[in-house]
A protein has these predicted regions:
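An N-terminal domain-start capping segment
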Residues: 14-18, 28-30, 393, 404-408
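Sec-dependent N-terminal signal peptides of Gram-positive bacterial secreted proteins and lipoproteins
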Residues: 4-27
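Intrinsically disordered, low-complexity polar segments enriched in Ser/Thr/Pro and acidic
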Residues: 23, 27, 35-36, 45, ...
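Domain-terminus/edge residues, biased toward the C-terminal soluble/receptor-binding domains
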Residues: 4, 184-188, 196-201, 205-415
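Active-site-adjacent loops and short helices of periplasmic peptidoglycan-processing enzymes
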Residues: 2-6, 26-218
Length: 415
């Protein structure tokens, strides 16, 4: 009798396990949802792209420079381009990558703004724009970032590169590795500050990709690049921003200028108006006036032709989705990929609607960050953009020990 009872219990456990694998656990059949909401607004073709930046039709603009590119920051859509794939020196715009790696080191906990940055003989000997660092001097990382962003100091950039990478050559390797990760296929860095060096080349498109990355993931850079004047050494060293658009253009937020004999006069400028964020890249202008005039022309075109419209709200936005074959039963959903606004062409008219698509259930295993659904934005029947809905946590596949534990809980009430 006891043997038959034990066999029955084993059979029950096996059946419970198989049932759980086949049909899931707490959440049952899950859901299928397509949610829509319509709103009358302007519309235009807009495609979410990362990291490639596709070009839109645009009128010819009078720009005195070798290369130019205008993108909308949130979507990455190219609004205007001129010789955007031509490789050329980019001068101190190089420092955008130096700043990106530095802010990422801060985010990772390897550095703080109070970290002291020593000055080496190598950093001391940098030419070009500088704050005249002396070997053995120390400044906080916050002070060095101000020197880099406001005065474009080459000596400060190299000192920070040595702190982050151990040496400037090692840091340059990190710069090139990060560029490759971002899809900057035409870029090769040879130094951390942008001084003319053979083979130190990039393109307007790659500069836009790099600029978009730092503005999106390290927006604190604007607290530095938006400073007009500052000082170091208890007021003895004055810093004045090289980006004159800060005083001349409404909505300018900052970023980086650059000038060398090989690169000409350059800028990657960021600006925001009414929620629309633009990045204008100008390379190889013959003069500072031409650089700022070209950037102004690009930004004027962008703000005049486009707008940022609110993403259409969805009447229902489920917080979780059922999972079959997992002890978790369901996973919470992550909607963080959805932007607050969508790029639209001014005056185009039309109906903007959003559509959320999710499966009935998910099959275990599910990994955190896995795409499990999408939000599509349409103008009429024309698809404008798609954004991923992701799983917010892992959901491991149910194992026999998991099934035994769940059965024990159900029989005894003891977890």
């Amino acid at each position: 009798m006891e043997r038959r009872n034990f066999a029955a219990l084993c059979a029950a456990v096996l059946c419970f396990w198989l049932f759980a694998l086949a049909f899931g656990t707490a959440q049952g059949m899950g859901l299928h949802l397509v949610a829509r909401r319509e709103a009358e607004t302007a519309s235009a073709q807009a495609v979410w792209v990362e990291p490639a930046l596709p070009a839109a039709a645009a009128p010819a603009l009078s720009l005195i420079c070798r290369a130019a590119l205008l993108i909308e920051q949130d979507s990455g859509r190219v609004l205007y381009e001129k010789n955007a794939e031509e490789k050329m020196p980019i001068a101190s715009i190089t420092k955008v990558m130096t700043l990106l790696l530095t802010f990422e080191a801060i985010h990772d906990g390897r550095l703080t703004l109070d970290t002291l940055v020593p000055v080496s003989e190598h950093a001391y000997h940098m030419g070009g724009s500088q704050i005249w660092l002396e070997p053995g001097e120390q400044f906080t990382l916050d002070e060095m970032l101000r020197a880099i962003c406001v005065s474009s100091a080459n000596d400060a950039a190299v000192a920070v590169a040595e702190l982050v990478g151990g040496s400037e050559p090692a840091f340059v390797e990190q710069m090139n590795a990060r560029a490759a990760q971002l899809g900057m296929e035409q870029t090769t860095f040879r130094n951390a500050c942008g001084l003319d060096t053979e083979g130190h080349l990039s393109t307007a498109r790659d500069v836009a990709i790099m600029s978009r990355e730092i503005l999106t993931h390290c927006p604190e850079v604007l607290r530095y690049s938006g400073i007009w004047t500052d000082s170091l050494r208890n007021g003895q060293t004055q810093l004045v921003n090289t980006n004159k658009l800060l005083k001349r253009y409404s909505g300018i937020t900052g970023l980086k200028t650059g000038t060398t004999s090989g690169a000409g006069v350059c800028i990657s400028a960021s600006a925001t108006r009414d929620g629309l964020k633009l990045i204008a890249v100008i390379l190889g202008a013959p003069s500072s006036a031409d650089r700022f005039n070209a950037a102004t022309t690009l930004l004027d075109y962008g703000f005049g032709a486009y707008e940022a419209a609110p993403l259409p709200a969805l009447p229902s936005q489920p917080l979780q989705l059922a999972v079959k074959g997992s002890a978790e039963g369901s996973v919470p959903l992550d909607y963080s990929a959805l932007p607050e606004t969508i790029l639209l062409e001014k005056g185009a008219g039309g109906t903007l609607r959003g559509e959320l698509t999710l499966p009935e259930t998910l099959e275990a295993p599910v990994e955190r960050g896995q795409a499990v659904g999408k939000v599509s934005v349409y103008q009429g029947e024309n698809l404008l953009s798609e954004y991923e809905v992701r799983a917010a946590v892992d959901a491991a596949k149910l194992t026999l020990p998991d099934a035994l534990h769940l059965l024990w809980e159900s029989l005894t009430g003891v977890s």
